[in-house]
C-alpha cells in the first residue's frame, strides 16, 4: 500500500531503470509521495547568492500555497530539502539533479518538473545548465512551468539563466577565476565573454540580463560590457540588466512590481540609452549615458515601467575601459 508520509523518499524513476540500467539523474523527496492538488500564484524570486534568505524562500513557498517545492541542480546534493521543509509547510520538497544531457532527455525528468508547484534553480555553474538543459524536454518543461503562471526562483547561477540574455560561462575551465570586470572592460569580445539567449522565457525578463554577487564581486564593469555586446551584436537596441548583490533578493509580483529584501547592498537596474561608441574585439569599451538605479533593502521597483522608489538613480559612462558615474566620489555601487 502506498503511504503518504513525511519521510525521505529516494526515488529512482527513470525510463532506463526498466531496462536494468542505473538512472541518469537523482531525485530525492521529503514529504508526501502524492502530488498536491493546489493552485499556485505567479511570482519570481531573484536571489543574489551568499547566504540563503529565509524571507525570499518563505515568499516563494507562499506563492505555492502548500504545494510541491522542487529544487533543480546540475550537480550537488539535496541540502535544500531539509532547509525548505523546516522553513515552510509544503506538501513535499524535492531536489532533482540533472547532470548531463542524457538525464535532461529522460521523460520522467520533464514529468517531475511539470508536476511541481514551485521551482527553484540552485546556484552552481550556469554553463552546465546551458550545456546540459538547452534544447531538451527539460527546457520545454521549465518554460511550460513559467508560462502556466507558476512561481519560480533562482540564486547565483540559477538566477543567471532566468533572463533572456545569459552570461553562459561556456569557455571557462574548472579552475578559472570568476570573469572579472577588468577583463570585459578591456575587451568585450574576450574569449571568456560568452553570451547566449532564449534559454528561458520568464515573463517580464525579455530583453534582460540577470546577474548575482554584484557589488561583492565588483561585477558592474562586466555587466556594462555584456549590455554593450548585446547591442553591438544586434540582439537588442536598449537591453536591461537586473543585478542582485549577495544576501539580497528581489521578489517580483505578476504585475511587475517588486520589492528588495535582505541584508546585502540590494538590487541594481541598468539600461542602455545610447549604443556603445567602441565595442570591438581587442579594444577597451567606450559607452555613455547608461541609466542606473540602486534599490537597497526595503525599496521597490517596477520592472514593467522600469522605475523605482526608495532608491537612487544615477548615470554611468565608460571611457576607454574606465568607469565614471554621476554619484559623489565616482561611486559605482
Which stretches of residues belong to each language-model region?
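Structural motif
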Residues: 46, 118-122
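Bacterial N-terminal signal peptides
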Residues: 5-15
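Catalytic-core regions built around general acid/base machinery
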Residues: 112-115, 135-149
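Catalytic nucleophile loop
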Residues: 122-123, 146-166
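C-terminal and late-domain segments of enzyme folds
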Residues: 21-66, 87, 173-333
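Short internal beta-strands
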Residues: 70-75
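Glycine/threonine-rich flexible loop motifs
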Residues: 126-136
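Portal/gating segments that form or line small-molecule/metal binding sites
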Residues: 76-115
Amino acid at each position: 500500500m502506498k503511504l503518504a508520509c513525511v519521510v525521505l523518499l529516494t526515488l529512482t524513476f527513470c525510463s532506463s531503470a526498466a531496462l536494468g540500467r542505473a538512472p541518469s539523474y537523482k531525485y530525492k523527496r521529503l514529504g508526501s509521495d502524492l502530488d498536491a492538488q493546489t493552485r499556485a500564484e505567479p511570482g519570481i524570486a531573484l536571489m543574489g547568492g551568499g547566504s540563503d534568505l529565509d524571507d525570499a524562500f518563505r515568499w516563494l513557498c507562499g506563492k505555492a500555497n502548500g504545494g510541491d517545492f522542487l529544487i533543480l541542480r546540475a550537480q550537488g546534493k539535496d541540502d535544500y530539502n531539509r532547509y525548505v521543509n523546516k522553513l515552510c509547510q509544503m506538501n513535499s520538497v524535492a531536489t532533482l539533479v540533472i547532470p548531463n544531457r542524457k538525464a535532461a532527455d529522460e521523460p520522467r525528468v520533464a514529468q517531475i518538473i511539470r508536476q511541481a508547484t514551485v521551482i527553484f534553480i540552485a546556484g552552481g555553474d550556469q554553463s552546465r545548465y546551458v550545456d546540459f538543459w538547452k534544447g531538451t524536454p527539460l527546457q520545454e518543461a521549465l518554460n511550460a512551468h513559467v508560462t502556466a503562471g507558476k512561481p519560480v526562483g533562482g540564486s547565483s547561477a540559477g538566477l543567471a539563466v532566468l533572463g533572456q540574455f545569459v552570461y553562459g560561462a561556456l569557455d571557462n575551465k574548472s579552475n578559472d577565476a570568476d570573469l572579472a570586470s577588468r577583463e570585459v572592460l578591456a575587451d568585450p569580445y574576450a574569449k571568456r565573454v560568452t553570451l547566449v539567449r532564449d534559454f528561458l522565457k520568464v515573463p517580464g525578463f525579455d530583453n534582460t540580463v540577470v546577474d548575482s554577487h554584484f557589488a561583492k564581486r565588483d561585477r558592474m564593469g562586466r555587466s556594462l560590457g555584456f549590455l554593450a555586446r548585446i547591442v553591438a551584436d544586434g540582439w537588442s537596441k536598449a537591453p536591461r540588466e537586473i543585478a542582485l548583490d549577495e544576501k539580497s533578493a528581489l521578489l517580483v509580483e505578476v504585475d511587475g512590481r517588486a520589492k528588495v529584501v535582505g541584508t546585502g547592498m540590494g538590487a541594481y537596474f541598468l539600461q542602455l540609452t545610447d549604443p556603445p561608441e567602441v565595442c570591438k574585439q581587442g579594444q577597451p569599451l567606450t559607452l555613455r549615458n547608461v541609466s542606473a538605479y540602486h534599490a537597497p533593502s526595503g525599496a521597490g521597483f517596477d520592472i514593467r515601467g522600469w522605475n523605482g522608489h526608495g532608491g537612487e538613480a544615477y548615470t554611468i559612462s565608460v571611457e576607454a575601459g574606465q568607469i565614471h558615474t554621476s554619484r559623489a566620489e565616482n561611486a559605482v555601487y
